[in-house]
């Protein structure tokens, strides 16, 4: 019995719960609680005092007459401009949790994207940082943007993800980084799941991890886009409590929030409420109801003020937005805040003066060198690929299974002159399989990784070139091993020439074709806006590549006006090189058990396939050019997409 009681205490239960457990064990009726239950507060106050975080000077953001317009219609048929934000002015100070509210389509996310520096073209007005015009690249280094969708690499543990962030963002010793990571995880309640993969975390844990990853370098400004969306009430309270604590630690916390509960609503320090792209209220939370009351808008008793202002902005009480716009422009918000002060003549407290900068961020470079970034990202990408069941394990097994199947289907036909065309079909199918096995996994996975890359790159974790080199290089070992395993099975089972040089050339051509196909997959994935588009475009691009490969139609048969297309088919060079490897290089006559064998001499096979004048080294050279050109093109597409996000 005593052990059961100690177990209950160890689980965090109070003495009353222990007594109840004992009573229930004895079979008696449970006692009636004679006192009211008191709710346990779980404010995360540790977020205010991180001793190992790098020191950063606080930041105040001021914006004056901010407007934003976009072109309507597609690029080939512009129909004028649409104004999304109109004449917004205000100031967001340190130590404040600011909530940007408004109905759907009010411009909340657009407004925050402009403040964070994610939107520049089409913006008018001025943004000041600590009283000086904002220098965008410097500002981006001292701020972070935590998006609504918590895009995390699913195959890393919480601790591994945090160490990657620390290694990329900080230049301190490894011991200091580990202490910092432990401190952040403990403060944010993630230490218990530090060895859990991010794919297995709950919604609230994922949100807190997204915050922890950005908190490593202690940014003085943090932007949150709908941080409570998709979370239950307890998780919402934990996240908002964390943001409140971070603000009290000297940071400027700005977040968009759609319709918070009354409990969450009162945790904000200031509100900036939008409707139809214009401000209808700005000021402290406690002043909202008196301000609306002064305008003749009475919030019903026991009604959530957040719900009430959204209903007003949505027009449920009539079109009151023009009146609210004029009231803000005429300064009624500031006047009402002044009247609500304890002393009537007291001016609302301004933002505290800027202290001398502790650790100014003047350099436009990243915290670590490109080589260091490459090494960290290469290790992370390699580990993710190694742990990915679909991308790696299934891909490897498919090469083994299909290789055995093809080997059994075309068993020992490589030296049979009467089955030459069956053998060429086997060789072509090998190129076809290796092409799709390299193309489709990349097409399917790269668009999903793009969201993680965009978040990390735009938050100044690493450079584009470091990420791209690590991404392309980390997958090369796997992309080499799988074709070599396939070729080792198929080549010997199908009875191809038992010469080491021919086998090595065959494997090299197969690997080169697979690498080119993977490069095309990177290009398609980088250029596609969604997984659905990439999934459609990938197989479609393979059709002309296969048609002009030289297997279905010889080069001389192709119409003159389409012959140029054959030079753009990388499968053509892989297939041509394989044919030269198997039947060229002065191979002896094939065995034939029939009386008449027109393809006993390998040279006749080369003439029939129209490759007798082809050069093997040219096939390797062209495949290498395809590989480099597609990789470079994919990099340029990625660079364009990054610039278009700014």
UniProtKB/Swiss-Prot annotation:
TM regions (residue ranges): 394-414, 426-446, 473-493, 504-524, 533-553, 618-638
Pfam families to which the protein is assigned, alphabetical: ABC2_membrane, ABC2_membrane_7, ABC_tran
Source organism superkingdom: Eukaryota
Gene Ontology CC annotations of this record: cytoplasmic vesicle; endosome membrane; plasma membrane
E.C. number(s) listed in UniProt: 7.6.2.-
Ranges of the Extracellular topological domain: 415-425, 494-503, 554-617
Domain ABC transporter: 61-301
Residue ranges annotated as Cytoplasmic topological domain: 1-393, 447-472, 525-532, 639-646
Catalyzed reactions: cholesterol(in) + ATP + H2O = cholesterol(out) + ADP + phosphate + H(+); desmosterol(in) + ATP + H2O = desmosterol(out) + ADP + phosphate + H(+)
Residues reported to bind ATP: 102-109
SMART domains listed in its UniProt record: AAA (SM00382)
Quaternary structure and partners: Half-transporter that forms a functional transporter via homo- or heterodimerization. Homodimer. Heterodimers with ABCG1.
UniProt miscellaneous comment: Whether ABCG4 is an LXR target gene, is still under debate. Studies performed in monocytes, and in one astrocyte cell line indicated that ABCG4 expression could be up-regulated by oxysterols and other LXR ligands. However, subsequent observations in a number of different cell types (primary mouse cells, oligodendrocytes and neuron-like cell lines) have not confirmed this observation.
Protein name as catalogued: ATP-binding cassette sub-family G member 4
Organism of origin: Homo sapiens
Gene: ABCG4
